[in-house]
């Protein structure tokens, strides 16, 4: 399994495409010998291994691939010869060229990499995805999304990088330029938590139902003034209280669904604060604004655990008791050791399994399967940060 970082455009590329000699490592020169078998001067090749094992090159190739009706003794003889010659296996580039595939899955992380990797949600989903792709001998190319206010800019890698399948994390808007760019190239795509689109596989969770469940939990505790701290509405990534006009149509699907979950419980939020990213400091900023006024809410539903933990820290900073003065709930189910002794009330999603599910869809696509939609369940975990509404 190889995990390729964001490509370094300062690295010079080969002036010409690889030839069969480049791929197989056949470099002219005085041959060395192994038991009477001529060897390449720089490194052993599959042909050298086949000669040493006294089998055909095709048989040696099948011995490494694990395919075909090859006797166990023959396979072992090939591997023994390879070990003695120091041959590590067929060149991956050559194998990719023969298959007509790059062996690479492009993963668009949905944000600047420096910000995305501060969120355990991203890393846990990637763990599940990369873990499954590793069993398929596929590499991963990480591609950041445009992080500025424009919705028309996409990373040049999306237009040029070799990839067999693309995975788009945190799908964004239905008219995403990322999806449009991948469609132009004809690259099969798996979308994580985005709007259903023709020809695109989608892996989602019942986040709308999960938010409805945690909101009803707060209603059962007697809360009536319930506010919301949200993920970004769109590429503008604003930071502040929402106007009625902006609330009307969030472009990003995750934000839209989780807001809808509050309404499904019969609640119109007392206030909605949009944050530019799922980070603790943005939750703390939102918490200070929402909890400083005279008509502060008695409960706050946050669209991520990192945002919720920031609100908890802001409440403590303002001298408010959680949950006696204000109840706070999140979404994700990640570890938040800095909140101890409190345990956040949250909606738990199966992060690693979500990534593995995406990996299985990638596998299915490479096998010729049609696009499909899979939705994973979520569960409410009641912690110590929610309690009865203050009198």
Residue ranges with predicted function:
Residues 59-61, 97-114, 225-231, 243-248:
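Short beta-strand segments enriched in small/hydrophobic residues
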Residues 1-101, 390-391:
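N-terminal helix-turn-helix DNA-binding module of bacterial transcription factors
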Residues 80, 88-155, 165, 260:
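Amphipathic helical "hinge" segments at domain boundaries
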Residues 164-167, 299:
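Short, Asp-centered acidic motifs that coordinate Mg2+ and/or phosphate
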Residues 1-39, 84, 131-135, 183-391:
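Bacterial carbohydrate/catabolite-sensing allosteric modules
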Residues 111, 146-149, 169-175, 195, ...:
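Short beta->alpha connector loops
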Residues 151-162, 284-294:
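Short, well-structured alpha-helical segments in soluble
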């Amino acid at each position: 399994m190889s995990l390729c970082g964001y490509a370094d455009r300062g690295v010079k590329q080969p002036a010409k495409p690889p030839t069969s000699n480049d791929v197989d490592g056949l470099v002219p020169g005085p041959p060395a010998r192994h038991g009477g078998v001529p060897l390449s001067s720089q490194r052993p090749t599959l042909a050298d291994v086949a000669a040493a094992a006294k089998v055909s090159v095709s048989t040696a190739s099948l011995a490494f691939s694990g395919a075909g009706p090859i006797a166990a003794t023959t396979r072992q003889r090939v591997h023994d010869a390879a070990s003695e010659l120091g041959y590590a296996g067929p060149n991956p580039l050559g194998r990719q060229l023969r298959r007509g595939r790059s062996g690479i899955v492009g993963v668009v992380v949905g944000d600047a990499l420096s910000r995305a990797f501060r969120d355990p949600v991203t890393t846990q989903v990637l763990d599940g995805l990369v873990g499954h792709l590793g069993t398929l001998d596929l590499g991963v190319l990480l591609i950041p999304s445009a992080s500025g206010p424009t919705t028309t800019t996409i990373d040049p890698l999306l237009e040029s990088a070799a990839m067999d399948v693309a995975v788009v994390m945190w799908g964004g808007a239905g008219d995403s330029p990322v999806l449009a760019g991948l469609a132009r190239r004809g690259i099969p795509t798996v979308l994580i938590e985005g709007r259903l689109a023709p020809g695109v596989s989608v892996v989602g969770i019942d986040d709308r139902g999960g938010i409805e469940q945690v909101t009803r939990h707060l209603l059962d505790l007697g809360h009536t003034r319930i506010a919301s701290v949200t993920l970004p509405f769109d590429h503008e990534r604003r930071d502040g209280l929402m106007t009625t006009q902006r609330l009307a149509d969030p472009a990003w699907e995750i934000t839209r669904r989780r807001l809808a979950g509050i309404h499904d419980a019969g609640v119109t939020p007392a206030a909605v604060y949009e944050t530019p990213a799922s980070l603790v400091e943005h939750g703390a900023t939102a918490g200070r604004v929402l909890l400083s006024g005279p008509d502060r809410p008695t409960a706050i539903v946050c669209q991520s655990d990192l945002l919720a933990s920031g609100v908890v820290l802001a409440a403590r900073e303002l001298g408010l008791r959680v949950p006696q003065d204000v109840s706070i709930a999140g979404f994700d189910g990640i570890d938040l050791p800095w909140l101890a002794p409190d345990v956040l009330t949250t909606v738990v999603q199966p992060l690693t399994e979500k990534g593995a599910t995406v990996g299985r869809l990638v596998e299915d696509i490479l096998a010729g399967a049609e696009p499909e939609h899979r939705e994973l369940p979520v569960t409410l975990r009641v912690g110590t940060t929610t309690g009865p509404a203050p009198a």
